[in-house]
Amino acid sequence: HILARDCAVTPESISIQDPVDVVLGSPRLKEAAEPLVEWFRANKRDLPWRQRMNAYRVWISEIMLQQTRVEAVKPYYERFLKELPDVKALAEVPEDRLLKLWEGLGYYNRARNLKEAAGQIVRDYGGKFPETYEEIRRLKGTGSYTAGAIAPFVYHIPKPAVDGNVLRVVTRITACGDDIARAATKTKIEKLVEEVIPPDAPGDFNQSLIELGAIVCLPNGEPKCGECPVRELCLAHELGQETDFPVKKKEKKRRIEKRTVLVFRDENETAVRKRPARGLLAGMYEFPNVEGHLTREEVIGYGKKLGLAPIRVKPLPAAKHIFSH
């Protein structure tokens, strides 16, 4: 699509009389940019990472917010920054203390990657946070979304920050039926967003898309179209198909495992072991456990292999543990 005026189009060229906006992707999204920014500035939530905004604070918040709800992150974020207020402190904190600060947020590799990236910043940039999208993107554990958040929010660089909220908003505005689980679809949406970023408000525009998806253009049910500042530009709304977008194919079936968990206790002490440094729940502590159901005799034999001699074996009630790491 080309949105232009006073122009002549031939197979070889486009001649334009006066400077105009040329949109090769989505004219609807281009037209939505200004009202989205105005709406965001008037309606944005008061969040701790939006106060005294700098690269380090935004970085920590964006990593914490991956796969985690805003309300759950708030107390962790404030406690984390109080103890680790800058890159140097994060680079030097012992891993056990770092994981204790992160305890309860899950996806612990996020914390390890933060520490490793902080070391990169100290080593390669003298402790000063890098200021270009490409340099930020090279930090350990920093993908296109996180780099695309820091670059425009802090340094006003016109790069897209496309997360699940933005995928939902853009696919609804454009009625894009591509599967959002595919990397190619995310790349396509990133290009659409990047093309229409207002040069004078890259941070607010990116945040407006995220904010709209978080509080208005909701998933899993009816979106609040009556509160949307761009509903008249939304093709899905025009078609009455808001809940048909985004399109996402079903995820793989869950794997179910049955294990026997052994809680070896001696007065006030309990035996735990550390998981391998790589793989599922890497480096985390756990109770010894084995696949399948162990009999009393097998528990005693397994304990002896660990250098323990159970005196009494007491069965515990069955329990279910679900996680998505």
Segments (PLM) and residue ranges:
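Intrinsically disordered, low-complexity, charged terminal extensions of DNA damage-control enzymes
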Residues: 1-46, 51, 214-325
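Catalytic cores of DNA base-excision repair glycosylases
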Residues: 16-26, 34-35, 39-226, 230-239, ...
